């Protein structure tokens, strides 16, 4: 843990970040920077007004308070020089990465072929041919049918990931032919998120961003409320995250009214 008395001291911040990068403990590094909200604007500095009332009307005051030039969109020469050099460093790093990636592809052709399949999904018609058909009068819980459907789909989509908020035993979306993703098995396709619906949905967003994996996650429908902010960001970002919500009946009984999703579907605007 590092504590910076002046969180506005950019040199001190950079020094702390570089120190954290060099840490060998293998543990997360925390930097606590003491700052003043709205610094440089006397009318709002150090008050809650600094959050939403800063606005353009204080721009000139802020420039003077922070000793910045009056010029709009001003970029100092040291910043220009730094980023020009940074661009060169990025190009060198990318060149090294391309060589390493080419060597990896040559050494692991099977894994490279799997990576190339990212984003190349089978058609819906093809997947429909693989999933089981159920009699119309089958006395089968929807989640049990979902369990039987996800297995062949997971075979056809080797980059599909299935997670649950500590409810795999109830949501039944576990990929039976695979194992858990964990420290000693990074190839596992089942993620155990714990009772953390928001974290589950947010992590699924992160997994989806690079377009390689197709994440799915599951919990009871009533707990969609906990994951809704992350779901909203997924919609805004057009991320193809799959949400599986079971126990969707208002007749869910043994857990009582806290688990009955009376208004949840309307809230999700499904």
Where are the model-predicted features located?
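Glycine-rich ThDP/TPP pyrophosphate-binding loop and its adjacent helix/strand module
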Residues: 1-85, 256, 261-265, 269-270
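Thiamine diphosphate
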Residues: 3, 80-81, 85-270
């Amino acid at each position: 843990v590092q504590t910076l008395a002046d969180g506005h001291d950019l040199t001190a911040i950079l020094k702390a970040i570089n120190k954290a990068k060099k840490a060998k403990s293998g543990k997360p590094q925390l930097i606590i920077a003491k700052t003043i909200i709205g610094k440089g604007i006397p009318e709002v500095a150090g008050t809650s007004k600094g959050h939403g009332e800063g606005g353009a009307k204080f721009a000139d005051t802020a420039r003077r308070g922070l000793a910045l030039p009056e010029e709009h969109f001003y970029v100092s020469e040291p910043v220009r020089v730094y980023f020009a050099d940074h661009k060169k460093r990025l190009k060198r790093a990318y060149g090294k990465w391309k060589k390493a990636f080419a060597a990896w592809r040559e050494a692991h052709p099977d894994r490279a072929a799997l990576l190339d399949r990212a984003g190349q999904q089978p058609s819906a018609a093809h997947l429909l041919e693989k999933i089981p058909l159920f009699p119309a009068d089958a006395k089968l819980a929807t989640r049990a049918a979902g369990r039987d459907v996800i297995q062949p789909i997971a075979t056809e989509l080797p980059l599909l990931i299935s997670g649950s908020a500590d409810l795999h035993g109830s949501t039944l979306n576990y990929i039976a032919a695979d194992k858990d993703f964990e420290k000693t098995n990074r190839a596992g396709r089942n993620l155990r998120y714990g009772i953390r619906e928001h974290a589950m949905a947010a992590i699924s967003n992160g997994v989806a961003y690079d377009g390689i994996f197709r994440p799915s996650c599951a919990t009871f429908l009533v707990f969609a409320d906990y994951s809704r902010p992350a779901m909203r960001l997924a919609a805004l970002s057009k991320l193809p995250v799959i949400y599986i919500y079971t126990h969707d009946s208002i007749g869910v009984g043994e857990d009582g009214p806290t688990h009955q999703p009376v208004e949840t579907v309307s809230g999700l605007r499904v």
